[in-house]
Every structure is written in structure tokens, then in C-alpha cells.
Regions:
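Sec-dependent bacterial lipoprotein signal peptides
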Residues: 1-24
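Extracellular/periplasmic metallocenter environments
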Residues: 23-35, 41, 48, 55, ...
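Well-ordered beta-strand segments characteristic of repetitive beta-sheet solenoids
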Residues: 49-50, 72
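Short, well-ordered turn and helix-capping elements at secondary-structure junctions
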Residues: 51-53, 60, 85-87, 99
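Glycine-centered loop/turn positions within well-structured domains
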Residues: 54, 79
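Beta-strand cores of secreted/periplasmic/IMS beta-sandwich domains, seen most often
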Residues: 59-77, 101-113
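Beta-strand signatures of extracellular beta-sandwich domains
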Residues: 80-84
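Surface-exposed loop/edge segments in extracytoplasmic proteins
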Residues: 87-93
Length: 133
């Protein structure tokens, strides 16, 4: 009886520790990391992107040049949104399932590729474009 009670406490401790680690790793917003500085001023437009099981919806978006906001809403797991080719250094949105993350960004005219940088997600189709005019 005493031995079973001890095992329960050990199991509870392991589960509690694992929950803490997973929660810390998969927390809500990524906030763009420490190297990214958001532009000041109001956003002209908010580009909303839903990240799901290996997809972005919409796959492509249009935005005006200047300060815009990008919002990632995640469903079905942890997802990120970064710009390919280092075009926006340090910018990173990260959201766990059912959560969202949002940052402002100052984009010049052009076509930007975005993708999820979680291993295997981009290769499985989690890539899109933002066209700025």
C-alpha cells in the first residue's frame, strides 16, 4: 500500500514536470524574438493567416507598403511564421493550437515568401506569399 502511494507521487511529479516543459516550449506568442524591433505607429492593415496541419490559409495575401500587422492563428498544433531569405531579420510569429501571435512589420513593395520553420512543416506545404504594393 505504501509502495503504491509512493509510485503515485512519483508519477504525479513526472507528469507535472513534463507539463511544465511542454507549456514553456509551446507557449503562446513568439513575440519576434529578441532581435526584432517592431515599427512604431498604427498598422494600415492586419494580414490574418491561419496555420493548420501543414497549411496556411490564405496561401497568399496582398498588403500596402508601409507598416502592417501580421497575425498568425494556430490550429492543430504549434506553428510559426517567418520570412524566407532573411528579408525581415528576427521576425517570427509562434502560436500553439488555439492561440495567436501578432507583430507589426514595415514592408517595402515586393513579393515575400513566408513559411513555418518547425522541422518538416515547410516541406509538407506550410509556405505562402505576401505581395506588397
Amino acid at each position: 500500500m505504501e509502495r503504491e502511494r509512493g509510485r503515485r507521487w512519483i508519477r504525479a511529479g513526472v507528469i507535472g514536470f513534463a507539463t511544465t516543459v511542454v507549456t514553456a516550449a509551446c507557449g503562446g506568442g513568439g513575440g519576434g524574438g529578441s532581435s526584432y524591433k517592431q515599427p512604431s505607429g498604427p498598422a494600415q492593415k492586419t494580414i490574418e493567416v491561419k496555420g493548420g496541419n501543414f497549411f496556411y490559409d490564405p496561401k497568399s495575401s496582398d498588403a500596402p507598403a508601409g507598416v502592417d500587422a501580421i497575425k498568425l492563428e494556430s490550429e492543430g498544433g504549434l506553428h510559426t511564421l517567418v520570412f524566407a531569405g532573411g528579408k525581415v531579420p528576427g521576425f517570427k510569429l509562434q502560436a500553439a493550437s488555439g492561440k495567436s501571435d501578432e507583430l507589426k512589420v514595415n514592408l517595402k513593395p515586393g513579393k515575400y515568401t513566408i513559411y513555418c520553420d518547425i522541422p518538416g512543416h515547410r516541406e509538407a506545404g506550410m509556405e505562402g506569399t505576401i505581395t506588397v504594393t
